[in-house]
Amino acid sequence: MHLTPDERWELIEEIARRTLRFGNYKHTLKDAIGDFTVKPATGIPFAIAILFVFWSVFTSFAALMTDGFMIKIFDNHWLPWLQQNFPGGPGNWFYALMVDVGQRQGSAIVASESCFDSFGVLTSGLFLPIGVVLPAIMIFYLMLSLLEDIGYMPRLAVLIDTFLHKIGLHGYAIIPTILSLGCNVPGVEATRILETKKQRFMMMTLLAMFIPCGAQIGIMQKVIPQYIGFIMLYLFVGYFLYGFIMNKILPGKTPEILMDVPAYQKPLVKNISKKMWMRTAGFLREGVPFVMLGVLIINVLYIFGIIEFMATAMAPVFEGWFGVPRETAGPLIAALLRKDLAIAQLGAIEMTKYQMISAVVLVTIYFPCIATFVMMLKESGRAFLGSLLALMIVVFTYGGLLHLIWKLMGVA
Amino acid sequence: MKVLLMGHPNVGKSVIFNRLTGANVVSSNYPGTTVDYTQGYMRVFDRDIEIMDVPGTFSLDAKDKAEEVAVKMLMENPDAKIICVIDTSKLERGLYLALEIIERGFPLVLALNMWDVALDKNIVIDLQKLEVILGIPVVPTVAISGEGISTLVEKLIDVEPVDILHISNTMKLSCLMTSPGCAGCKGC
């Protein structure tokens, strides 16, 4: 037998009347902090402070670990050891693939001095994910887990709600967005908490295009720290701009949300460390092999001249429309596998700083990495075709816009 | 035997799941951490029991895709036993979902989670009375520290479905209690 909702509530009211007693409740410090962090006047400055601390700790810890520790191990010990002991040596194709493709100096090819340049499966293929990305995502996930377990995320959602409503989403969209800053895959999965198809479609498309993942940010932090601020700003502006446009032209509902803001909790060290480890392990399991595979594929494509062929064929688009060197073709292929790998490759191409910014933006928005692609396909089914279409339009308009800006500034 | 962990978002289902199975499911302090189900196993009295951590849902009328997963899980497992996890401080709205599940004929154990938080808030619940009225086991738990979890498992083994009519009838019975001349019954 089924009751109507009204009957159910009546029954519950009666049950509660007989079993439930509320004593005096004193306003505690927890409630005071809760109010402080959610009221706009105090909450917004607090949120900015939190995000600033997050960013500062993230960049300084990642830089400290990579420059102070990882680079020394990889460049002073691992690379020279391989260069001496790996069978084949310079000139051998297998050696080039696995250890060091070498650096052109005039007509001669000399040994690389860093794991950034050597671009072998065992050198760059290990150094990028472990030496650069691992410290970055570890510290990212530590802080993310902290914010999650304390219960800060829903407050951030409340604060940004009005803003996100302007683009047809609501505050809770901040959760998939922040998760995506770690990795787009769980971010796309988290779009399930949004109510309508339209919201999910918009969110997924925006995430895949405009939110760089932790691995990518980690490499950007290493390769182009001086431009990262501008690039992130341009991406966030794109997120809102295209969100606004999609909201206007797409059919479907964008309902209000009633949100539960849970009480703050003391985070448990055990839970935090467990989550951090699980997420990091996920990266080691799925990220590292993909970077190594990516290095291998890119090297093979270079050897057979396929990348050069594509670069030449696509040159008018790259150079004419986007204003980036045609060599960007290589990184764009790598980006299909791993965006972090693509950024590292860009670092090795000669270009002006404006071209570099354009190229990084292009790598970010032009297509999701394979892992995100698969998750989007799984989560959205046929609507994915729509996502791809939106993506194409955005790449050409927003990527071209940046080129136009440089032209107007007279630097392109 | 199959067990589904159901309840509102952010009441601690995943923490209980990790406790029961020793698994490592991500749990956080915000609604919507779990958006897909996870399966796990626990062994009780030499029996393997399959447990599923289900995304949080406010009712059985799904409002988003995570809730759809939850409702679908329930429909696909008509033989399952349910642990309905409730935030003790929000008993009433938790009961709404519990009643819905009871109405569909599932045997159910009620876990009043975050019992400690409710105590701090001076919220007092008459557990025995609640058990008698509902006709199902009610177990106070504190999932993050593990309190009440073993009791929860014990009660789960023998739980039977109850009739929603029985519940409303019990309420009527205990109504008689308050009228003069009532000799008393087990209803309160």
Predicted regions: what they are:
Chain B
Residues 171-188:
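Cysteine-cluster motifs in flexible loop/terminal segments that predominantly coordinate metals
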Residues 42-46, 69-138:
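Conserved C-terminal guanine-recognition region of P-loop GTPase G domains, centered on the G4
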Residues 1-60, 77:
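Conserved G1/Walker A P-loop phosphate-binding module
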Residues 32, 56-57, 88-91, 114-118, ...:
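Conserved nucleotide-binding/hydrolysis micro-motifs of P-loop NTPases
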Residues 116-167:
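Canonical P-loop GTPase G-domain recognition
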Residues 31, 35, 50, 62, ...:
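Helical mechanochemical/support elements of P-loop NTPase systems and associated helical scaffolds
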